[in-house]
């Protein structure tokens, strides 16, 4: 992966940061701010910002603590915060966007960038990048492009995540198979799961214990499989990057594994909504496809024998890439874009904010802050940091830009189509054809 530019700068004082940001955004981003109100959002001449995100209680407490530090460093600026669970958050943000504007600063999912940038809800940040009002010298340039839409920057990654494979090393040892590692293949995956199934173990409710969950309905797993073969999910904002043959081959592979009893049964995969309800969490499988951020939940639930490994490869070519666990964007209609940009920069680049936020949003994109915080990590959190370092040295392909606006309904349709395969309502070929037809309609609508 490209190395970040050298020459990291010291944190700016609050006066310097706000003065530089206000000057730059006041003039250079005039076009991006056209039509925005300039009235104060606070009282007595002060500035009031809104900042919203999704996440658990720990993330909320840490984020609020970092925001209070920002307020202390910027007298006259207050930040009203709010957070919710992901489903409710997505719905509320969509309602706000439709009603006139999202908050001054909003946490965004990778799949939301095209939706809100294309809909005019996000402020362009190119000028803020160019003038270092949002400092990026300690961030990977190829990773930053995940916040781009139509060639312009609309969001900044707040955490760097990567797909992986949680597995129970004690079961692998019992089966006499090696632990998965960089370069292991889908054929290895099949062989290992066959050995585990042959142990004849049973779940707590007496059903056969399998090698892993069924990744067939998971678009992230398919993307890793596809990229490992040189493909991609999207060729453009309106075109898929894969064919019916590609998807049919993947689903045929997954379907065969399930029918042979090597991966979890259909009903168990469809019931998986969390770590606890996954086949692995329920004692039905030895492994699970997941992301680095939620991985610590597996050893917390199942014990320290659970570790994190790469997703299988095709011929040793890794399809995984570093993806933003979430991003920060500024509302296009913010009355105080300068201060909103200053808050974004503070959360990403201030070492004290980095210490407070830690790895609550996965690995911080600022490499210096990530290395600093990593010295305090233990257990599963340290394992995912070391895993990310290993994968970076392994040589991953650059991440794609944000998915197109139709990606969310395509993702939902993907899981629904594979369920038809699992419950024998369609063949892999039929389901692939149906999914591609539906995806074309969504992308062109």
Language-model features: where?
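Extracytoplasmic "Venus flytrap"/periplasmic binding protein-like
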Residues: 69-138, 173-176, 278-287, 441
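A structural signal for short loop-to-beta-strand junctions that line the ligand-binding cleft
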Residues: 103-104, 135-171, 318-320, 394-404
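Hinge/lid segment of periplasmic solute-binding proteins
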Residues: 111-162, 307-309, 377, 382
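Conserved C-terminal helix/tail region of periplasmic/extracytoplasmic solute-binding proteins
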Residues: 2-5, 10, 173, 394-445
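Glycine-centered hinge/linker elements that transmit conformational signals in sensory
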Residues: 193, 237-268
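Extracytoplasmic/periplasmic solute-binding protein
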Residues: 154-158, 163, 187-241, 285
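Extracytoplasmic/periplasmic substrate-recognition and gating elements
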Residues: 72, 175, 259-263, 299-363, ...
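Mature extracytoplasmic/periplasmic domains
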Residues: 293-296, 331-408, 429
């Amino acid at each position: 992966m490209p190395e970040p530019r050298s020459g990291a700068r010291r944190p700016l004082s609050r006066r310097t940061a706000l003065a530089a940001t206000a000057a730059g955004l006041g003039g250079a981003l005039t076009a991006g701010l056209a039509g925005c109100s300039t009235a104060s959002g606070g009282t007595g001449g002060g500035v009031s910002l809104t900042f919203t995100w999704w996440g658990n209680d720990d993330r909320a407490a840490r984020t609020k603590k970092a925001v209070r530090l920002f307020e202390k460093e910027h007298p006259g600026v207050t930040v009203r915060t709010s957070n919710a669970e992901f489903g409710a958050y997505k719905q509320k943000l969509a309602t706000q966007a439709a009603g006139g504007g999202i908050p001054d600063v909003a946490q965004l999912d990778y799949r939301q960038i095209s939706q809100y940038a294309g809909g005019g809800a996000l402020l362009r940040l190119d000028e803020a990048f160019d003038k270092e009002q949002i400092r990026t010298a300690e961030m990977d340039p190829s990773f930053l492009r995940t916040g781009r839409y139509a060639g312009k920057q609309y969001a900044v990654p707040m955490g760097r995540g990567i797909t992986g494979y949680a597995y129970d090393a004690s079961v692998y040892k019992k089966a006499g198979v090696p632990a998965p590692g960089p370069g292991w293949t889908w054929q290895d995956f099949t062989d290992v799961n066959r050995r585990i199934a042959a142990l004849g173990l049973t779940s707590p409710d007496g059903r056969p214990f399998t090698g892993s969950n069924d990744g067939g309905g998971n678009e992230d797993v398919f993307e890793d499989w596809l990229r490992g073969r040189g493909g991609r999910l999207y060729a453009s904002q309106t075109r898929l990057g894969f064919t019916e043959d590609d998807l049919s081959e993947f689903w045929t592979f997954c379907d065969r594994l399930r029918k042979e009893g090597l991966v979890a049964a259909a009903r168990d995969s469809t019931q998986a909504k969390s770590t606890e309800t996954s086949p692995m969490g329920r004692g039905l499988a030895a492994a699970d496809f997941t992301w680095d951020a939620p991985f610590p939940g597996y050893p917390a639930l199942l014990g320290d024998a659970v570790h994190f490994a790469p997703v299988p490869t095709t011929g040793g070519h890794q399809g995984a890439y570093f993806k933003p666990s979430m991003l920060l964007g500024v509302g296009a209609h913010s009355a105080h874009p300068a201060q909103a940009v200053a808050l974004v920069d503070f959360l990403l680049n201030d070492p004290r904010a980095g210490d407070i936020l830690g790895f609550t949003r996965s690995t911080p994109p600022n490499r210096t802050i990530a290395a600093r915080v990593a010295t305090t990590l233990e257990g599963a959190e340290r394992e995912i940091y070391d895993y990310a370092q290993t994968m970076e040295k392994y040589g991953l392909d650059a991440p794609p830009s944000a998915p197109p606006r139709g990606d969310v309904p395509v993702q939902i349709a993907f899981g629904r189509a594979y369920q038809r395969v699992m419950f024998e309502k369609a063949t892999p070929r039929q389901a692939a054809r149906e999914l591609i037809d539906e995806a074309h309609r969504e992308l062109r609508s």
